[in-house]
């Protein structure tokens, strides 16, 4: 069991690393503090892109895009997996993403991913995933 703290980690780099780990092993991966992951780039552009993605399609036929930060992170990881095939479905079943830290994982040691740290950003432009989901109307 691996517990990853997403606090201050870049969303895409975190997602790609987790996707590789899920496909290569049989270990369950828990991600906590999903709302504190960051998306690099301009605030206005990022919010506009996520709003457009959310509003694409219809309520009847989709595509359906989540509002909550834990679901957005899980959807991002899903996009990096062959989720329509058996090994991708198995990998997704081993992934759990949480907003905050649940009580059963409070005493567990968490790890961080050095390659995904936001201090590696060359620019100071970023927005937290929790703020993006709040702007889209989430009440997490």
UniProtKB/Swiss-Prot annotation:
GO biological process: negative regulation of translation; translation
InterPro entries named among the record's database cross-references: Ribosomal_uL13 (IPR005822), Ribosomal_uL13_bac-type (IPR005823), Ribosomal_uL13_CS (IPR023563), Ribosomal_uL13_euk/arc (IPR005755), Ribosomal_uL13_sf (IPR036899)
Alphabetical list of CDD domains matching this protein: Ribosomal_L13 (cd00392)
Highest taxon of source: Archaea
GO terms of molecular function: mRNA binding; structural constituent of ribosome
Keyword Ribonucleoprotein applies: yes
Classification via Gene3D superfamilies: Ribosomal protein L13 (3.90.1180.10)
Name of a matching Pfam family: Ribosomal_L13
Claim: Ribonucleoprotein is one of the keywords in the record: yes
GO cellular component: cytosolic large ribosomal subunit
The entry's keywords: Ribonucleoprotein, Ribosomal protein
PANTHER family according to UniProt: LARGE RIBOSOMAL SUBUNIT PROTEIN UL13, RIBOSOMAL PROTEIN L13
UniProt record similarity statement: Belongs to the universal ribosomal protein uL13 family.
Subunit structure comment from the entry: Part of the 50S ribosomal subunit.
Protein's job: This protein is one of the early assembly proteins of the 50S ribosomal subunit, although it is not seen to bind rRNA by itself. It is important during the early stages of 50S assembly.
Record's protein name: Large ribosomal subunit protein uL13
Species of origin: Methanosarcina barkeri (strain Fusaro / DSM 804)
């Amino acid at each position: 069991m691996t517990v990853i703290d997403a606090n201050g980690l870049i969303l895409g780099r975190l997602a790609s690393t987790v996707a590789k780990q899920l496909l290569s092993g049989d270990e369950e991966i828990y991600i906590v503090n999903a709302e504190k992951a960051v998306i690099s780039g301009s605030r206005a552009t990022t919010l506009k892109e996520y709003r457009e993605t959310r509003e694409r399609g219809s309520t009847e036929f989709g595509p359906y895009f989540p509002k909550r930060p834990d679901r957005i992170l899980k959807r991002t990881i899903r996009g990096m997996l062959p989720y329509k095939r058996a090994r991708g479905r198995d990998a997704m079943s081993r992934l759990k993403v949480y907003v905050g830290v649940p009580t059963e994982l409070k005493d567990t040691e968490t790890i961080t991913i050095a390659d995904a740290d936001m201090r590696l950003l060359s620019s100071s432009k970023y927005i937290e995933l929790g703020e993006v989901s709040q702007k889209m109307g989430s009440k997490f």
